[in-house]
Amino acid sequence: GIDVRVAFCFPDVYEIGMSNLGMMLLYNMFNKRPDVWCERVYSPWLDLDKLMKEQNIPLFALESQDPIRDFDFLCITLGYEMCYTNVLQTLDLSQIPLKAADRDESCPIVIGGGACAYNPEPLAAFFDLFYIGEGETVYDALFDAYKANKATGGSREEFLLKAAQIPGIYVPAFYDVTYKEDGTIASFAPNRPGVPEKVQKQLIVDMDKGYCPIEKPVVPFIKATQDRVTLEIQRGCIRGCRFCQAGMIYRPLRERDVEELKESARAMLKNSGHEEISLSSLSSSDYTHLEELVNFLIDE
């Protein structure tokens, strides 16, 4: 049976959110677990936002139409800083208290992840926890800890304490942060025992073992910004440009096996009805087997 219900939010409109590869990878991975049911949620546009507030309609998940506040987890992917106000809109429309400190046992655990989670402090008050790094590494342990805590009747705080011990998980409530006059961080220290002093980012070491390929992509019911199959061919980048955040945080470079990519491409095109495929990475021209892969895709 289903033990853990997850609402996965991309805090922007559907057309943009449906084109996000990171969200689709984790949505696919979560739903492969028989004990987890993951659904999607996006930020409504201004007209719908206004209507939902007027009619007192809480924000709901796409698949079941159940209110977000009834879920165990609300996972919000933070791709860029410009969506931070949409994060607050999502919490507000879901009728979940904006600040983590004001939430009780009936509220979902609100998780932040993605590229912006590497600088969590601007949003720390609004999240119960952040995962730092690539989501594939952390979530299985997190869901298992949640299930174990639920089975013993543990409290929200007991779960967060267990979660804080999982590598890559940052629970802002368990740390004291002080600032210098210019707004930069002066000190960062845990405020209770058993919580690590530093949170280290977690990465998939082997892309052939840790990666969960998408075989059946969800097809949008309206035109999305990227109306094609997206195939991730590698992670990280060898260039090391100083201005590039992604190049720094997704180090080191890890390539996917070319034979696996061929299988993935075949399955995704067959199961989606799309006729175009984009090869996704920070620097696709650096992929070792690019010529072989492109020739295969043209011939197929």
Would you name each region that the model predicts?
Residues 30, 74, 128, 237, ...:
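Conserved, mostly hydrophobic/aromatic
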Residues 43-190:
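Glycine-rich beta-alpha loop elements in corrinoid/cobalamin-binding modules
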Residues 9-11, 41, 77, 113, ...:
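Short hydrophobic segments within beta-strands
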Residues 1-7, 14-15, 172, 178-230:
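N-terminal [4Fe-4S]-dependent radical SAM core
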Residues 14-17, 46-49, 82-85, 117-120, ...:
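Flexible loop/turn segments at secondary-structure boundaries
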